[in-house]
Amino acid sequence: MTTTQVSQLESTFCGANGLSLFYQAWYPQRTVKAAIAIVHGFGEHCDRYSTVTTALTQAGYAVFGFDNQGHGRSEGQRGHINRWQDYRDNVSAFLAQVRQHEPNSPLFVLGHSLGGLIVLDFALNAPQGLTGIIISGPPIRPVGIAKPYLVAIARILSGIWPRFSMDVGAGAETLSRDPAVVNQTEHDPLTHSVATVRWGTECLVAIAAVRRNIKQLQVPILLLHGSADKVNDVKGSREIFEPIAVDKTLNIYPGGYHEPHNDLDRNQVMDDVVEWLDNHLNC
């Protein structure tokens, strides 16, 4: 499997608060089975998903990715949102772009880490038109960030100084066991590790809402998590998986770090994703 691929479309669309958001698309060299929309994680961007785009296009899927506000090549203060609704609005606008390109194809949304939380929240609030969702390493139990004293401080600052920024990065070495991935991430000028206190408090509210409402999920879900994830504890994925009442699959990868799609067993991960997609095209 190759690890790089040239996108066949690059453009922008208008997101929340009028921000210009960058997106791109990759197409298979055959009839499109379905459209896959990628929502990336905190501090990264959609160009970091070459393993995913290559595997999925080779399997016949059209793949779309965008840089969320404050990330990558999109506008916005790094690591800041005014309110969680901004993320919902951005995903809604992004999926509208995907639909313009693939109006008749089944639509799946793949979210990793923060993107997984965003997609879970979106699917719980606006499931219409979604064929299924793939969630990777979601921050249901973020390691170290949600300590009570930090939460208390963040809530105070969020009200009086919402754009106060701090470094919350876990370190590239926690993302993958592959030294090449770690090195590439450390030297990637489009990644960052800065977040504002408002971003943090909004994320905590979203996590609580997903935990509270996950049993209401209406679309099929594939949940992926590395057993040795040092960023978001795998226990969080197990906890939300149990009450889900619809078609659900949980894959936990032994020894896997935070990014299953960029880890040592990424080929197996992508084989699992493709198999699940192929089995859910007509759901």
Model-derived features with residue positions:
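Catalytic active-site module of serine/aspartate enzymes centered on a nucleophile-bearing elbow/loop
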Residues: 247, 254-283
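Conserved alpha/beta-hydrolase
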Residues: 53-77
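N-terminal cap/lid segment of alpha/beta-hydrolase-fold proteins
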Residues: 1-28
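Short alpha-helix in the alpha/beta-hydrolase fold that links the catalytic acid
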Residues: 219, 233-242
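Alpha/beta-hydrolase-fold enzymes
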Residues: 112-196
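Short beta-strand/loop motif that positions the catalytic acidic residue
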Residues: 217, 223-225, 229
